């Protein structure tokens, strides 16, 4: 059996924790196009303030690099790059496309490639695969293994950390390859959940965050209503919580890289089938309006 040589592409909030988990067992290449990020990591400095110096110390032959030639020896690639929205809230895949173009230049027979970035269903099996097939070594889609594993990291959350969050993994491969995949990802998460279809794994990620966004939007809507009717929102929720199946979510601003973005990925995916996700978009509209609502409340109090 070939020695597993992982490469994590993208060393941000998602990729760096994966790198740190894997370097305990493997010689890992941590690759990022941002030279300043690499320079800081080499001197054991994490600008995101998620990890301490001891966490970033490297043993054996693991490295941080921004040079694509350093990933040529790798055979297990994990892509964890941002997928921000473009103008008009359309999905933006430029970092994913760039990462897969980089891999296509070094891909070899029997390589395993995983996408962890949040994308709309079909991205892995169609868009990413198409890029890989343009490789210079003329490797066919029968000679490499492409999969998807959604990231679930919650930055700053010490309770729900990378190791104890279950990890969904999907790849079109035989049991031998799946065992190899588990061998790698078991160093990241204690519980691996296998999905039979890559598209279903991709969609599940969008739903996780969209559900939370919608639940918060409902609380925001009720809070606005209570304000207009001069009712105590906290008292209303306290009373509602006395029912056993009431789910408590807090109102407020919804930010970050995921919750304000993923509903639009879901909506875009649905629109390809000429279906409009009305509830999803309504929730986004409410949450987007909260900035003005809260600002106006503060101004009135001044």
Where are these regions (language model features)?
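Aromatic pocket-lining residues of Rossmann-like dinucleotide-binding sites
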Residues: 21-22
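Short glycine-/small-residue-rich Rossmann-like dinucleotide-binding loops
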Residues: 81-83, 118, 173
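Glycine-rich Rossmann-fold phosphate-binding loop(s) that bind the pyrophosphate
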Residues: 9-12
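N-terminal Rossmann-fold NAD(P) dinucleotide-binding loop
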Residues: 15-16
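Conserved N-terminal Rossmann-fold NAD(P) cofactor-binding segment
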Residues: 2-5, 27-29, 33-76, 81-91, ...
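NAD(P)-dependent Rossmann-like dehydrogenase/reductase catalytic/cofactor-binding core
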Residues: 3, 216, 223, 227-302
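Internal alpha-helical scaffold of NAD(P)-dependent oxidoreductase catalytic cores
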Residues: 130-149, 153-245, 269-273
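Rossmann-like NAD(P)(H) cofactor-binding subdomain of soluble oxidoreductases
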Residues: 85-152
């Amino acid at each position: 059996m070939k020695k597993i040589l992982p490469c994590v592409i993208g060393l941000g909030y998602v990729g760096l924790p994966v790198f740190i988990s894997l370097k305990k067992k493997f010689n890992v290449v941590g690759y990022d196009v941002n030279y300043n990020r690499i320079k800081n990591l080499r001197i054991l400095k994490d600008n995101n303030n998620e990890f301490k110096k001891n966490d970033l110390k490297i043993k054996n032959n693991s490295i941080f690099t921004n040079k694509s030639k350093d990933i040529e020896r790798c055979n297990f690639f994990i892509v964890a790059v941002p997928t921000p929205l473009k103008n008009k809230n359309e999905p933006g895949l430029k970092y994913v496309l760039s990462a897969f173009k980089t891999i296509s230049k070094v891909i070899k027979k029997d390589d395993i490639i995983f996408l962890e970035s949040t994308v709309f269903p079909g991205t892995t099996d169609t868009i990413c695969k198409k890029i890989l097939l343009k490789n210079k070594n003329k490797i066919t889609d029968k000679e490499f293994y492409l999969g998807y594993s959604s990231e679930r990291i919650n930055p700053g959350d010490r309770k729900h950390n990378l190791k104890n969050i279950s990890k969904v993994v999907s790849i079109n491969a035989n049991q031998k390859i799946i065992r190899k995949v588990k061998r790698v990802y078991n160093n990241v998460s204690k519980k691996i959940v296998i999905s039979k279809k890559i598209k279903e794994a991709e969609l599940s990620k969008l739903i996780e965050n969209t559900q939370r966004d919608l639940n918060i939007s409902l609380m925001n809507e009720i809070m606005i209503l209570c304000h207009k009717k001069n009712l105590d929102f906290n008292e209303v929720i306290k009373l509602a919580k006395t029912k056993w199946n009431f789910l408590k979510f807090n109102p407020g601003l919804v930010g970050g890289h995921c919750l304000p973005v993923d509903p639009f990925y879901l909506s875009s995916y649905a629109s390809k089938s000429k279906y409009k996700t009305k509830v999803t978009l309504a929730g986004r509209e409410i949450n987007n309006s909260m900035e003005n609502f809260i600002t106006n409340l503060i101004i009135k109090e001044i």
